[in-house]
Amino acid sequence: MRIIVLGSAAGGGHPQWNCHTPASQRAWQQADGAQRRTQASIAVSADGQRWVLINASPDFRQQILATPALWPQHGLRHSPIESVLLTSGEIDHIAGLLSMRESQRFSLHASSRVLDLLAQNPIFDALNPQYVDRHPFALNTPLTLCDLQLTPFSVPGKVPLFMESRSGGDLAGSNEETLGLTIDDGRHRVHYIPGCAAMTDDLRARLHGAELVFFDGTLWRDDEMVQLGVSQKTGQRMGHMSIDGTDGTLAAFAQLQVARKVLIHINTTNPVLDAHSPEHAAVRAAGWDVAHDGLEISL
């Protein structure tokens, strides 16, 4: 199995277009080797020829330009991307679909909830149904794409930002709002969870002893953006666990015996993005990698 991290940042990327916090300043200046990051998405392949795109980032075109494996290979029109799978209806997971409207054949897979959101917004009709088939999937039921078995499962989260005003106060929404994904090629198994609000017993059992897990790294601490003065929202309010703290990711994974752990979907305010920070040192000491655009893992 081949996995390419196309984007590793949370919504808005790093640096976010209007952000001047310390972490973002370093990225603007590319000081001390600071890396800029696009919004989170990965591509996976069993053979290096046919690829499944996991979430369609607003930075889709930039990510393709940076990834030769996904360039057109033959004919006048071609893409190695044969399927797209969405783990939520968040803007940073669906907006890239609008950059895939040029009459290129691929299959689109999502929960019924997310497909309904797309159907309700006529802008997504730009995806010509003659070329793009939309397929709802069932939770905890494997589907086979490009010789990979992909199993979506529910994790704690919330409704997309643009649906909050229509949620009636139920921000958690249905069990199809926020999903994780298990990817299996018959020899190796990977878990991709770019958004998660809490570690549950079911999730703990699923991840215990895993070979590779990509996990929500949005914020270092729950009140990070509040303390910086850039937002009144906590991580929990946004549907994300924080890395630090007694209920945080480092503590939750401490006994799970995961062979390789990678933080992804990292907010532009998060100090772990600074490779010289004590927070970055702490996650590295706990056995975590911090994803960056272009990271490639072969299993």
UniProtKB/Swiss-Prot annotation:
Gene3D superfamilies: Ribonuclease Z/Hydroxyacylglutathione hydrolase-like. Keywords: PQQ biosynthesis, Transport. May be involved in the transport of PQQ or its precursor to the periplasm. Belongs to the PqqB family. The keyword Transport applies. PANTHER family: COENZYME PQQ SYNTHESIS PROTEIN B, HYDROLASE C777.06C-RELATED-RELATED. This is Coenzyme PQQ synthesis protein B. Pathway: Cofactor biosynthesis; pyrroloquinoline quinone biosynthesis. One of its GO terms (biological process) is pyrroloquinoline quinone biosynthetic process. The keyword Transport applies. Coiled coil: none annotated. Pfam families: Lactamase_B_2.
